[in-house]
């Protein structure tokens, strides 16, 4: 998968404005579209991307020069693309690109927007006003932030990410909870993430040794975002592509990407960077899932498959309680009938019970949980493409 550039208006492949509204995926998938993000997004089909990562201009122009204690100059963001006449102008810009993003986002898709205190609250307001539903705010704590050289404020050591679904009804969005938990030593992943800023060999430099892009994000940050909220084969959109971190990480992790960028030097750097990436293999990309992600199996399916017969006696692993399987898929015990969960709870005097793990059947003198039979059904469903 080599990245192609759809230049706007001069093209190495095709002109962005030549892309029909219902352009086939191959016309823009794994591509960098050159141009203004709003205009370029208008050429993509409705509901065509799974996840959006947006790193918009922060509007953080600094007044005057900044110097370190040794009087060396601090390299601040002074690019023209980060300049806005007023908050109103920035709000109008934000609303325009968010509206365009919302149209191309799938109903079950999600968007991530990163920013600093200069802009993230204004972005959050626009997200809510446009109908997006906020899922989390994530704090990226920097292990090596820039000091506050003037000593007039706290050291700014974090940036904020907002994660949102397309709307409140956007059910079924991807969140790889089990994978995130396993990666965090089997503890729930928190909403504060600790990563260093992009430095060293990862930082793109030009022939003079200067930074290619002033706000290049670390690949580890994008990798966590994609591993948390997407699946292999999903389409990741970055409307402010910059140096191509999103594309590089997407390619490595087996996701598709589409980037939008108007500055040719950034496009050149991103293209070379992405073309040098080697994708991981299928085994390395398999996402860990939990039971909530597995297909639902009714207890009657176990009986219909002939794995249990009416009249079978089930018991708990210590043989303290027993119940009889009935033909209709219910259990009966102590004169009461109900589901495997209800009867499991009733015999123990509990309010709830997982009947799949509580009830056991005997095979060759060995007790086994009926959950083992459910696993067989799920394997059959997977083999049949269910």
UniProtKB/Swiss-Prot annotation:
Keyword S-adenosyl-L-methionine recorded: yes
Q: Which Pfam families match?
A: N6_N4_Mtase, RAMA
Could you say which enzyme class this protein belongs to?
A: transferase
Q: Name one GO biological process term.
A: methylation
Which keywords appear in this protein's UniProt record, sorted alphabetically?
DNA replication, DNA-binding, Methyltransferase, S-adenosyl-L-methionine, Transferase
* GO CC term, one of those recorded: cytoplasm
Entry protein name: DNA methyltransferase CcrM
Source organism per UniProt: Brucella ovis (strain ATCC 25840 / 63/290 / NCTC 10512)
Lineage, top ranks: Bacteria, Pseudomonadati, Pseudomonadota, Alphaproteobacteria, Hyphomicrobiales
Gene symbol of the encoding locus: ccrM
